[in-house]
Every structure is written in structure tokens, then in C-alpha cells.
Amino acid sequence: MQQTNPAAVGDYLRKLQQEIVAAVEAADGGTCVRDAWQKEPGEALQGSGLTCILEGGALFERAGCGFSQVRGPRLPPSATQNRPELAGAPFEAMGVSLVFHPRNPYVPIVHMNVRMLAALPEGKDPVCWFGGGMDLTPCYGFEDDAVHFHTVCRDALAPFGDDKYPRFKTWCDEYFFLKHRNEQRGIGGIFFDDFAEGGFDNGFALLRSVGNAFLPAYLPIIERRRAMPWGERERAFQLYRRGRYVEFNLVWDRGTHFGLQSGGRTESILLSMPPLASWAYQQQPEPGSPEAALYSDFIVRRDWL
């Protein structure tokens, strides 16, 4: 049986966070606030983390990238839906999670997460599994952006088998779906959870490949769109679409539920929230408009490659 090495995963995740935060600061010109935190003695979870956030920047209205490494006495229900035999076991969880909300409505929202969860059943070997992925949520869709993003995702997974991209792409489409709206959240990407195929070494290698692919997937899209002019109409639609992001994260997202159920740090869990969002009753885009094209051509399940 392969040895598990959670410490190596933690080292990698800290380094990944540093690289991404440096890239955010370089692209925006601003400086992230770095908030190192430690859980208080006696709390349900013990551990620490680093939250990095840039607010009010030239490029990013809000860009948060958090690392956390925590231990808890019992796995919460959201983590054992597929592994009932581990219900109630102590656990260790670590990960990097980010959401970037750009100021320009033509630059898409992006989300990325890579994580490891280790169940620590008494008297037994640790059981480790990995999860994560990345997905893109444009307010205004561009075919070449979608193709680029999905190409980088596919290439990151190629060393692990030809089945991984189509499988994780479908998983992403199914996961980032607003059931109450019957609507995709964005143009998708890749998503995986409870991944333990090939043992610890293979799972960790896949995690690294996905994490390392994030900047090549997103930075070229920023550069293509950041200088596009926009006005009140685009801003209003951006805020309306951000409302969908809020709905998904609070109603459907397992990561949000896991964090809140397990006594996680609320400020870090809600790092994904946009600074501003809006709702309008039964808003319908004008036929033939770029806003209408988002619904008909982009936030639908389709093969981009």
C-alpha cells in the first residue's frame, strides 16, 4: 500500500497560493491583503491558513485566494455522502480555493480549487482522496476564450488517461448547475471529487497538474478582454449575473456547506462572494443581443473542443 504524505500536499498548496497571488498582483497592479489565521483552542476545528484578498483593484473588484489546513473530530455529512463507512471519523482537510471577480464585465469570473481530505479512522490507515477543478463564468461569452480554457484543462488531465477530461468536464457541467433556475452557472471546465484512483501518488500528481494549469488557462483571457470598453448596460448585466453566482454558492455548493457544517472560518468560506450583485424580477435579454447570446450559446452544455 502506498504511503500517504499530507505534509507534501500542504507544502505544494502553500507554494501554489504564493504563485497565484503574485500573478494577481502583477496583473492588477494592486497588493493583496494577507491575513494569516489560526483556529482558537477549544474550537471544533483546529488548524491554520492564509487568506489573500485584493479588493477595489484596477482589474479585480474582488479577488480572493485562500489556503487552509484544518483537523476535526468528525467528518461532516457532506464529506461522507459517498463513503458512509467513514462517517464520524476524524479528518484532516487542506486546500487552495480562489474566486476572482473582475471589474470589466468582459473579463470572466473564474473559480479554482484543489484540495485533499484525509479520513483518520481509529486503528486504521488514513484514507485520502482529492478534489478540485476550475471553471469559467463569463457575463459576455467569447468562443475563443472557452476553447482556450477547455484546451488547457484537457491538456492538464491528458497524462492521467484520455477518459479524465470528458469525465471531469461532464462532472463540472452537472455540478455547476442551478437546479432552481434550470441554468448552467458558466461555460464549465473540469471538476472532480472523492478522487483516489491509482492511490495517493497518482491523486497528488493529478492535483498538481490541475493546480499548475490555472494561470495558463486564465491569464491569456484576461489580457484579451481587460481593455474592452464597457458602460452602464454591461455593468448592470454583470451585477445581475453575479446574482446567479451568489445563488449557486449559498444554495448548492458542497464546499460552502462542508465549511459551514464543520465549523470552518466563515470569512474564508465566503471569499467567493462578489462585492456587489443585483436581482431583477423576470429580466429577459433583448433578442439578438450579446446578453441573449450568453444564454443561447454559452451557458449551455456543449463540447468546446
Curated annotation (Swiss-Prot):
GO biological process per UniProt: protoporphyrinogen IX biosynthetic process
UniProt pathway: Porphyrin-containing compound metabolism; protoporphyrin-IX biosynthesis; protoporphyrinogen-IX from coproporphyrinogen-III (O2 route): step 1/1
Keyword terms, alphabetized: Cytoplasm, Heme biosynthesis, Metal-binding, Oxidoreductase, Porphyrin biosynthesis
Catalytic activity: coproporphyrinogen III + O2 + 2 H(+) = protoporphyrinogen IX + 2 CO2 + 2 H2O
UniProt binding sites for a divalent metal cation: H101, H111, H150, H180
Matching InterPro entries: Coprogen_oxidase_aer, Coprogen_oxidase_aer_sf, Coprogen_oxidase_CS
Main location: cytoplasm
Places the protein is found: Cytoplasm
EC number from the UniProt entry: 1.3.3.3
GO terms, molecular function: coproporphyrinogen oxidase activity; metal ion binding; protein homodimerization activity
Binding site for substrate: S97, N113, V114, R115, G263, G264, R265
Keyword Mitochondrion in annotation: no
Cofactor: a divalent metal cation
Taxonomy, superkingdom: Bacteria
Region Important for dimerization, residue ranges: 245-280
EC top class named in words: oxidoreductase
Residues carrying the site annotation Important for dimerization: H180
Active site: H111 (proton donor)
Protein family: Belongs to the aerobic coproporphyrinogen-III oxidase family.
Function as written in the Swiss-Prot or TrEMBL entry: Involved in the heme biosynthesis. Catalyzes the aerobic oxidative decarboxylation of propionate groups of rings A and B of coproporphyrinogen-III to yield the vinyl groups in protoporphyrinogen-IX.
NCBIfam families, sorted: PRK05330.1 (NF003727)
HAMAP family: Coprogen_oxidas (MF_00333)
Name of the molecule in the record: Oxygen-dependent coproporphyrinogen-III oxidase
UniProt lineage: Bacteria, Pseudomonadati, Pseudomonadota, Betaproteobacteria, Burkholderiales
Gene from which this protein is expressed: hemF
